[in-house]
Regions:
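N-terminal cap/lid segment of alpha/beta-hydrolase-fold proteins
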Residues: 25-73
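Short substrate-entry loop that stabilizes the transition state in hydrolases
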Residues: 74-76, 81-119, 210-214
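Alpha/beta-hydrolase active-site loop
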Residues: 123-144, 165
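Alpha/beta-hydrolase fold nucleophile elbow
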Residues: 146-157
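Short glycine-enriched nucleophile-adjacent loop
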Residues: 160-174
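Short alpha-helix in the alpha/beta-hydrolase fold that links the catalytic acid
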Residues: 199, 213-223
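C-terminal catalytic histidine-bearing segment of alpha/beta-hydrolase fold enzymes
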Residues: 230-283
Length: 283
């Protein structure tokens, strides 16, 4: 290859590299924020006053997050993502954010474990994650490029269980200044007694998922009131846990549960998410 051609290719590579790295749509930014503080209820405050106590407002927990955004000034709709009990796997931290950014959404993936020095919570629960979600929402409200009226909460497994808890009637949502517009739940642990959601909700799970059983989600839907926001439940026949995650192309058994990717179910679920967000995060 002659010197002129080599020089041109080098310049072209440099140009492409610079412009791709400068494009916000291709950049992932590490950000820091705090979970929403556990707000004291009016009842708790009143009881403390009756007993002569002075209560201090609890502080939020420092958290890390990964922020991705489309090119342009916005304001854009946004999606807050809560990872599962196994922390930040590839599909949650990279594949879904890139997909959502292509669709026109700002994405904030919340890391609930690193600052708490946790490896996983697959044998336990972390109820504080509801407050992590609202801390992320507060963070986005200060960005200037997010339309805070159009933010959805999306979670996977344990993260989705937290998402459903964060958007339920009589839950902590009523104490929060800012609200989510919609919720997307991949294979959550549904609770038939959780009550009505406060926002339109999309739930997707596999028929053979014995970790997040579809029957429990079906029971919850059967108990919703007539005035509940719309809830869509998609149960994919013959499908296991983590069906949307290509890192589980070869199935594996974890704590007695099968995790296995399925390309067809994954594609169907992505189309459902796309249509759901387009509908409920529209202007």
């Amino acid at each position: 290859m002659n010197t002129t051609v080599s020089g041109l290719l080098l310049c072209l590579a440099t140009f492409i590299g610079v412009h791709l790295s400068a494009n916000p749509a291709d950049a992932e930014e590490l950000v820091r924020f705090e979970s929403a503080p556990v707000k004291l209820s009016p009842f708790r405050i009143r009881k403390a006053l009756e007993q002569g106590e002075i209560l201090s407002q609890p502080q939020g927990t420092p958290l890390l997050g990964y922020l991705s955004r489309p090119a342009g000034d916005g304001p854009f709709p946004a999606v807050v993502i809560l990872h599962g009990c196994d922390h930040l796997r590839l599909s949650v931290k990279e594949l879904w954010p890139k997909r959502l950014v292509r669709w026109g959404y700002v994405v904030l993936v919340v890391d609930s474990f690193t600052t708490r020095k946790l490896a996983d919570t697959c044998r336990s629960a972390l109820p504080e994650r509801v407050f992590d979600a609202y801390g992320a929402l507060d963070f986005l409200s200060k960005s200037g490029f997010v339309d805070i009226r159009r933010v959805a909460l999306m979670g996977f497994a344990a993260g989705d269980t937290a998402a459903l808890d964060a958007t339920k009637t009589d839950g902590n949502e009523q104490l929060m200044e800012r609200k989510f517009r919609a919720a997307v739940a991949y294979y959550p642990a549904c609770d038939a007694d959780r009550g009505d959601p406060t926002v339109p909700t999309l739930i997707m799970t596999g028929e053979r998922d014995n970790w997040s059983r579809a029957e429990r989600c079906q029971k919850r839907l059967a108990r919703l009131s007539d005035n509940a926001p719309p809830v869509e439940l998609n149960v994919y026949k013959g499908i296991y846990h983590n069906f949307d995650a290509p890192e589980f192309m070869v199935g594996r058994r974890v704590l007695g549960h099968i995790e296995k990717y399925d390309a067809d179910a994954a594609a169907k679920s992505m189309r459902s998410v796309y249509a759901f967000l387009r509908k409920y995060l529209a202007n």
